[in-house]
C-alpha cells in the first residue's frame, strides 16, 4: 500500500538529481566556451598566486587553466578543493615532481593531480571510442606521448560532420574550440560536480 508512493517519490528525486546534474554540466560547457573569447598565450611558467581563488595572469595559461577557470565561473575553486584533498591524502597523489608536501601555486595546475582528484571524488567515467559517451561539460584527459598529458572540456557543439563533440582546451594556441576528442590517446574521462 505504501510501497508504490514511496517508489514514485524515490523516482521523482532521482529524476530531479539527474536533471540538476545535466543543467550544471550544460552551464559548465557554456562557461568554458566563453573562455575562447579571451586572448591567452600558452605559458607553462611557475607562478606564485594567491590562495584561495588564485589564478595565473589572465592573458596566460595552460590546458589545466581552462578547466580551473571554467569551474571558477561556476563558483568552484579547484585550487582550494585540490589543495585541501592533497593536504589530507598526499600519499594518494602522483609523485612525479619529487615534492614532499603540497604547493598551492601549482598542484591544481597539473593534469595527473586533477585526474586523481576527479577519481577520488567519484567523477571517473568509462573511456570509450564512442563520441556519444562524451557529454557537454565532461572533462577529458589525454596522453600526448611520453609523460606529457593534456586536459580539456567537452563543448555543447559538434564537429562539422556532427559525429563528435568539440573540445575547449589550450594546447599551445590559446583557449580554443577544436575537433580533437580522439586525436590523442584518451586516458581519463570525468564528470565532476561538487
How would you label these PLM feature ranges?
Residues 49-58, 100-104, 125-128, 173-178:
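Second-shell loop/turn segments in exported
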Residues 24-29, 87-168:
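...with weaker cross-activation on analogous glycine-rich loops/strands in unrelated enzymes
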Residues 33, 37, 68-76, 83, ...:
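Sec-exported extracytoplasmic/periplasmic mature domains
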Residues 10-19:
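Hydrophobic h-region of N-terminal signal peptides that target proteins for export
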Residues 3-10:
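Sec-dependent signal peptide recognition
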Residues 44-64, 77-101:
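Acidic helix-start/capping segments at beta-turn-to-alpha-helix junctions
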Residues 162-194:
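Low-complexity, Gly/Ser/Thr/Pro-rich intrinsically disordered linker/tail segments
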Residues 19-61:
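Active-site-adjacent structural segments surrounding the nucleophilic cysteine of cysteine proteases
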Amino acid at each position: 500500500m505504501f510501497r508504490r508512493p514511496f517508489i514514485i517519490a524515490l523516482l521523482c528525486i532521482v529524476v530531479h538529481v539527474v536533471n540538476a546534474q545535466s543543467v550544471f554540466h550544460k552551464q559548465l560547457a557554456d562557461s568554458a566556451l566563453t573562455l575562447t573569447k579571451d586572448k591567452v598565450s600558452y605559458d607553462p611558467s611557475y607562478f606564485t598566486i594567491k590562495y584561495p581563488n588564485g589564478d595565473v595572469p589572465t592573458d596566460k595559461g595552460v590546458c589545466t587553466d581552462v578547466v580551473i577557470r571554467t569551474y571558477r565561473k561556476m563558483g568552484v575553486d579547484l585550487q582550494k578543493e585540490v589543495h585541501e584533498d592533497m593536504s589530507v591524502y598526499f600519499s594518494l597523489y602522483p609523485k612525479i615532481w619529487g615534492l614532499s608536501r603540497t604547493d598551492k601555486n601549482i598542484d591544481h595546475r597539473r593534469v595527473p593531480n586533477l585526474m586523481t582528484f576527479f577519481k577520488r571524488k567519484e567523477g571517473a567515467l568509462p573511456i570509450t571510442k564512442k563520441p556519444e559517451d562524451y557529454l557537454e561539460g565532461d572533462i577529458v584527459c589525454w596522453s600526448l606521448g611520453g609523460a606529457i598529458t593534456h586536459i580539456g572540456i567537452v563543448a555543447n557543439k559538434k564537429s562539422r560532420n556532427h559525429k563528435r563533440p568539440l573540445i575547449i582546451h589550450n594546447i599551445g594556441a590559446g583557449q580554443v574550440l577544436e575537433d580533437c576528442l580522439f586525436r590523442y590517446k584518451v586516458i581519463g574521462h570525468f564528470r565532476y560536480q561538487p
